[in-house]
From Swiss-Prot:
Residue ranges annotated for the SAM-dependent MTase DRM-type domain, each copy included: 336-663
Chain positions covered by the region annotation Disordered: 1-24, 91-113
Protein's UniProt name: Probable inactive DNA (cytosine-5)-methyltransferase DRM3
Biological role stated in the UniProt entry: Involved in de novo DNA methylation. Involved in RNA-directed DNA methylation (RdDM).
Keywords: DNA-binding, Methyltransferase, Nucleus, Repeat, S-adenosyl-L-methionine, Transferase
Source taxon at top rank: Eukaryota
Record-level Gene Ontology MF annotations: DNA binding; methyltransferase activity
Gene assigned in the entry: DRM3
Lineage: Eukaryota, Viridiplantae, Streptophyta, Embryophyta, Tracheophyta
UniProt-listed GO biological process terms: methylation
Length: 680
């Protein structure tokens, strides 16, 4: 009999009046909002978004403030018309060939010469077909420099549209030139070198998913000499600080097993990063690194005299400074981790998996929050037809691993045999790159590429072949005819990721939503390889606590391994994800119990203790990439990684390990007492 309990409405785990009161007193970090105090002469907090939007379009902050004071912030069309009108009037006053004068936002008169980005792009009347025509248009009509045009074409490719090229150049100019032309023409060469370095870094940061406003602000603050990694870390730090900096850590005494005196020298105001917990009896503030139970036994040698240095910024000095964003993994095949302490290696096991490519420096910081266990990197191409770099932090044994049987297809041809008849020999792809979710313009792209093949008359130049392959890799297009390309449909994505057929096929869920639900999902063959060691350790079944379960990748991997699931407590805020997992649980006739919880914020200390008591503990705590399956509104939704949610996963791991460790000690003492009693 399958017993499924859904805690979305409070069943399974009772929600008390006290819990509701706690939620009101201690709002969730995701719900925190900064209070903006209105000052005379400045736009109100309600207009800050509108102000940022128009400044991001390239208008002078002073001009935007003046227009907002005159017209208010409710009618965007009126504001835009006023800005364009005043910009046009000011622009006709004088012309300046200096980039410094052109973009000096502190000088209202000079800043008015800058045509807003939207206006510049709208002025493009033609779509040049060849790179030479685009180059000529950018140089003669748009008056960009030769070096700006060369850099844009090199970075975006000759097939990029004029709009994309103009947007790239203008973004670099806005980010890199905030000062005046104070040094005269003698410094132009130096400024040009700095400009193109800034433009290159700007492109990298935009490709990483950061907003233009974030990129422009961080470059202006950190300076053009900062590396891409340093700039990215700074943006991450700002995002983290804005979402959780004002939350206090509430830690009960037995959590840390430390005395009161160990806190006496600590000042809350010095804490750069704070955490949230739920004990109201003993409230203390402590640095984030001390949230771990046995911190003194850790192998990290990091000094503790840097309370104001955000953990996401540490160690960036040791990284390369060449501006490179993509860092290759040392070993892309699974390897043995070297520094799992004996006490950490004991159950309950934990596994945190991240399928989003992030810098090594960030991985180092993540591992420090999980007992300094080194991450294990793997490429899913060794287990499937998906080539994706993944990382896992876990304390699982590594001996006795095995592949899932039957294995998922290892190549595109194995996954989709129908492509054999139409796959061109010059398309050498064997595997797909990622779960592409972008659908805007995909049909037009397929039609354009197909027309390129048809018009070639059977002969494609190497340049066109390279271009077609590049577009196919970006959008994960496959050949469905001699001159026809198509994106993957949801069932094909399910097959690549190792999920059952029609796993995400819910009533009312369109194909795009189905693919979006799989965007950050585990590849079950890859995950199953790491989890396979549990089969011999737990022949009678596993008790699983699954954090950010997504569409159930961890449970499916264990099921494919043939490991019985005694219970799965699944935490995921997406109603779609919960329905998908619940239907799979029922369809596979699982004998255990599924308990679904709709938010990690419900896993308070007393709730975790009740769950451990109810199920007798957990054998493994699995965490993955957070995804709301609604487009996301979290601070790092574009990357699929929410730092705040990761810290909550760490909190749960630490709490569960401590609760179970405490119960084991009590059980041992009780057994010893019973053993001695008969002899007394």
């Amino acid at each position: 009999m399958v017993k499924v309990e859904d805690d979305v409405e409070g069943s399974g785990i009772n929600a008390s009046v006290g819990d509701l009161r706690d939620a009101a007193v201690n709002p969730q970090p995701a719900l925190l909002r900064a209070t903006v105090k209105e000052e005379e002469g400045q736009p109100s907090s309600s207009s800050s978004h509108v102000r940022s939007q128009f400044i991001g379009m390239g208008f002078s902050p002073m001009l935007v403030d003046r227009v907002l004071q005159k017209h208010g912030d409710r009618d965007s069309d009126t504001i835009l018309e006023a800005l364009l009108s005043q910009s046009a009037l000011q622009k006709s006053g004088s012309e300046s060939g200096s980039l410094g004068d052109l973009f000096d936002s502190d000088n209202e008169e000079n800043s008015s010469h800058f045509a807003p980005r939207k206006e510049v792009i709208q002025d493009i009347k033609v779509e040049a077909d060849s790179s030479s025509e685009k180059r000529s248009y950018l140089l003669s009509t748009m008056n960009f420099s030769q070096r700006e045009v060369d850099l844009a074409l090199n970075q975006l490719g000759e097939e990029a549209s004029l709009e994309q090229l103009v947007d790239f150049i203008v973004t670099g100019q806005v980010s890199g030139c905030s000062g005046g032309n104070e040094n005269g023409d003698a410094s132009n060469e130096v400024k040009d070198e700095s400009l193109f370095g800034v433009m290159d870094k700007t492109l990298h940061l935009l490709q990483m998913g950061f907003t233009e406003e974030e990129v422009s602000s961080v470059i202006d603050k950190a300076g053009p000499e900062a590396t891409v990694l340093e700039l990215a870390d700074t943006i991450f730090a700002r995002r983290i600080a804005s979402s959780i900096e004002q939350k206090e850590v509430k830690v009960e005494p037995d959590f840390l097993d430390e005395t009161e005196t160990s806190y006496s020298a600590y000042h809350p105001s010095n804490s750069g990063l704070r955490y949230y917990d739920d004990d109201h009896d003993n409230i203390r503030i402590k640095r984030a690194k001390h949230m771990f139970i046995d911190d003194s036994a850790g192998s990290s040698s990091r000094a503790g005299n840097q309370p104001n240095l955000d953990p996401w910024l540490k160690d960036h000095r040791a990284t390369t400074s060449d501006g490179s964003v993509k860092e290759e993994f040392d070993a892309m095949t699974p390897g043995i981790r070297r520094n799992v302490r004996s006490d950490v290696a004991n159950p309950p096991y934990f596994l945190y998996g991240n399928v989003v490519e992030i810098p090594k420096a960030t991985w180092r910081q993540l591992s420090e929050f999980l007992y300094n266990v080194e991450p294990e990197f793997v490429n899913s191409q060794f287990f499937s037809a998906l080539s994706r770099k993944e990382g896992y932090i876990h304390n699982l044994p590594t001996e006795g691993r095995r592949n899932l049987v039957p294995r998922s297809p290892m190549t595109i041809e194995e996954a989709f045999p129908f492509t054999r008849q139409c796959w061109p020999s010059w398309d050498t792809r064997k595997q797909l790159n990622s779960v592409a979710t972008e659908v805007a313009g995909i049909e037009q792209l397929c039609e354009r590429l197909g027309k390129m093949v048809r018009d070639s008359g059977g002969y494609l130049s190497q340049e066109k072949k390279t271009h077609i392959m590049h577009q196919c890799k970006l959008a994960n297009l496959i050949w469905v005819g001699p001159d026809r390309l198509s994106p993957l449909d949801p069932q094909q994505v399910e097959r690549i990721l190792g999920y059952p057929r029609k796993h995400t096929n819910l009533f009312g869920l369109n194909p795009q939503d189905r693919i979006e639900a799989m965007r950050y999902s585990f590849q079950t063959d890859t995950l199953g390889y790491l989890l396979s060691v549990l089969k011999d350790l737990y022949p009678d079944g596993l008790r699983v606590l699954s954090i950010y379960s997504g569409i159930g990748g961890a449970a499916i991997a264990l099921h494919r391994l043939g490991i019985p699931l005694q219970c799965v407590v699944s935490v995921d805020q997406s109603d779609t994800n919960r329905k998908i997992l619940r239907r799979w649980w029922s369809n596979t006739e699982q004998k255990g119990q599924l308990r679904q919880i709709n938010t990690i914020w419900k896993l308070k200390i007393n709730v975790l203790e009740d769950l451990v008591k109810e199920f007798g503990g957990f054998d493994i705590i699995i965490g993955g990439n957070f995804s709301s399956c609604k487009g996301g509104t979290t601070v790092n939704s574009s990357m699929g990684m929410d730092s705040n949610q990761f810290f909550e996963y760490v909190r749960v791991v630490q709490r569960v390990k401590h609760i179970m460790g405490r119960l084991q000690v009590r059980a041992h003492e009780s057994a010893r007492h019973r053993h001695r009693s008969p002899s007394n």
